[in-house]
Amino acid sequence: MAADYPNIDIAPFIDHALLTPTATPEQVDQWCEQADRYNFASVCLYPTYVKQAAEFLHGKKPKVCTVIGFPTGATTRSVKLYEALEAVENGATELDVVINLGCLKSGNTEAVHREIAEICEETGQVVKVILETNLLTDAEKKIAADIAMDAGATFLKTNTGWNGGATVADVRLLKEITRERVGIKASGGIRTLNQALDLILAGATRLGTSRGIDLIHQRDNPEKVE
């Protein structure tokens, strides 16, 4: 039961995600209004909607977060950098960047580092590096985490949500690796309050989810949470 957990306000942990391919401008306004109303950390949307979200949230607390190289991470370094710079120009202050998994798995760690470092240095914004942990071994997770931290990442993010969701085990592992030097964003498949609280207690400092409103309703109606 949610009532058995510590009294944690989950709202400031939530990156309110709208990453469905069918997202509309009307939904973007709805997500921004919800993020402001419930004091979420950010809205996380595709680059095409960054300018709209930045205008809606101007002067308000929630940040505008977007995704770079999403969801595969397989675009070229120059394309990712351009995408990131354009997003910042349009008003994004947080960038969730998918790591180049092919380079990582083939041992080309220099390419992985260079790509992340360029985005961190040239944008000067919060960068959350998406590791896609469900596709990595524990050894690869450590290598990827170390590269991202050395390159200047602000957060490590577990997943895109396209290849499975966040797990408590992965969050614990990342906390052990990072020793709290950077934040940890758990993302993918977060649908219940208990699941969200388990991830926070394991070490997550952000939660990426499209179910933020559901989590708030579960928080406010604990008697209905199973």
Swiss-Prot record:
Disulfide pairings: none
Stated name of the protein: Deoxyribose-phosphate aldolase
Active-site residues, as the UniProt record annotates them: 96, 157, 185
Residues spanning the signal sequence: none
UniProt similarity note: Belongs to the DeoC/FbaB aldolase family. DeoC type 1 subfamily.
Function: Catalyzes a reversible aldol reaction between acetaldehyde and D-glyceraldehyde 3-phosphate to generate 2-deoxy-D-ribose 5-phosphate.
Subcellular location: Cytoplasm
Main subcellular location: cytoplasm
Enzyme class per UniProt: lyase
GO molecular function: deoxyribose-phosphate aldolase activity
Catalytic activity from the UniProt record: 2-deoxy-D-ribose 5-phosphate = D-glyceraldehyde 3-phosphate + acetaldehyde
NCBIfam families (UniProt xref): deoC
Pfam families per the UniProt record, alphabetical: DeoC
TM region positions: none
EC id: 4.1.2.4
Native species: Trichormus variabilis (strain ATCC 29413 / PCC 7937) (Anabaena variabilis)
Pathway terms, separated by semicolons: Carbohydrate degradation; 2-deoxy-D-ribose 1-phosphate degradation; D-glyceraldehyde 3-phosphate and acetaldehyde from 2-deoxy-alpha-D-ribose 1-phosphate: step 2/2
GO cellular component term of the entry, any: cytoplasm
Keyword Chaperone appears in the UniProt entry: no
UniProt keyword Cytoplasm, yes or no: yes
Gene3D superfamilies for the chain: Aldolase class I
Biological process (GO), any one: deoxyribonucleotide catabolic process
Keyword entries, A-Z: Cytoplasm, Lyase, Schiff base
